[in-house]
Swiss-Prot record:
Residues involved in substrate binding: G425, L426
Name the record gives this protein: Light-independent protochlorophyllide reductase subunit B
Summary of subunit composition and partner proteins: Protochlorophyllide reductase is composed of three subunits; ChlL, ChlN and ChlB. Forms a heterotetramer of two ChlB and two ChlN subunits.
Assigned protein family: Belongs to the ChlB/BchB/BchZ family.
EC class: oxidoreductase
Domain of life: Bacteria
Amino acid sequence: MELTLWTYEGPPHVGAMRIASSMKDIHYVLHAPQGDTYADLLFTMIERRGQRPPVTYTTFQARDLGGDTAELVKKNIKEAVERFKPKTLLVGESCTAELIQDQPGALAKGMGFDMPIVNLELPAYSKKENWGASETFYQLTRTLLKDKVSFSDKISPFRWKELGRRPKVNILGPSLLGFRCRDDVIEIQRILSEQGIDTNVVAPLGASPDDIERLIDAEINICLYQEIAEASCEWLKRNFGMEYTNTIPIGIKNTIEFINEVHEKLDLPLTNKEELENKSKLPWYSKSVDSNYLTGKRVFIFGDGTHAIAAAKIAKEELGFEVVGLGTYSREMARQVRATAKDLNVEALITNNYLEVEDAMKKAAPELVLGTQMERHSAKRLGIPCSVISTPMHVQDVPARYSPQMGWEGANVIFDDWVHPLMMGLEEHLIDMFKHDFEFVDGHQSHLGHTATNKNNILNSDEKKEKNSKEEIIWTESGRAELTKVPFFVRGKVKTNTEKYAILRGIPEISDETLYDAKAYFS
């Protein structure tokens, strides 16, 4: 067991809550102690929803453990069914309740209800939130469609031609507490409609049990978020022959690949690549003169598997950045992230420890960080611009405006969100350079979000004394003055290289001349 003040994912029952809260006519009875009801806040505070999640907690207390907690479970299940009248009931237990082994799912199935009951057995001590969401969606899909499985009749992706209608697809994976899922769905539906393709069902977001039963009315499935939907897509392919897409339409190239993959599976004519590229401003903006100085900028990426892999491809192939770090907390997608990292000649970081991520960030010395809410905090401490690309996120990353990550408009949003911090960083450096002018004063608040620059900390963000790990290094006044002229987003790297050079040459004091010599040495 590990004690930490931050975690990238909650326990698996939070993933189950995400699926239940995303859907209609479903209720989730969770066998849990009083303290586990905190999860409600994730939906009302971060997602800013106007209603509570459809979850009933048994909320047992310490004094209940001496009695029959199974009766408490049955009482809560009965009351939830009578009050909410769901079409499908999910039953599970939290990490604490798992230790009691009351088997709430088995109890619910023995109560004689005339509705589908999904027994969620989510191992809380070995799995986490995204796996819990994936397993819940998979079990729900399987429960509602298992009676319709036919081993003789498989769904053909060309069936729409025989029926004389437009092709239909399902969009699977978007859920509450996902990163910009609501807007991604709108954007992808718009793109598909432009290609003459209708959307049959979007699930789990906004779907009902009746919609899940209609999944087999479509020709293929769009696996929009692999962490949530891949297991369900595999089951549908195995039992109904339904093909599904593998390309995630984040970025211009991926969106074009996605459209062509859908066309190939449905036997539609392929589209013109140049014509599609003009639908977003990102290609032109990234080629414009104003963006030339962005080429080769060092970027560190960490997030869920879907967004981290897509971000790496956009950074390298569409914006001309140099990816110096890539990682994920999603162990289920570790293989894909490692493969992407290998293509970029970097070592993948697979961890759920934010301190390891921050340490890797320091060593990589990036000029831009793309990550989660925690990487934003770490980047502030290190004085590096950051843009959030993945959950877990803060309420400020759930905008009221239309702000997708996928498709053409998503590419526009990404360009703004990634490039503007770098532009602001350049402006920040100019302010730092000319702060001796009367228009500027020390202590001026930075618009990057971190606190004003403290001249005592300008050389080091995390050390009080200026020491190298091998021996003490003394910076002279001239050396300090010259180092402050270096843009803050590369200052850490310049300082490290200069100290390495000083140790290599046996120089006890670093002056401005030493800094110049070090620059020439490492050039």
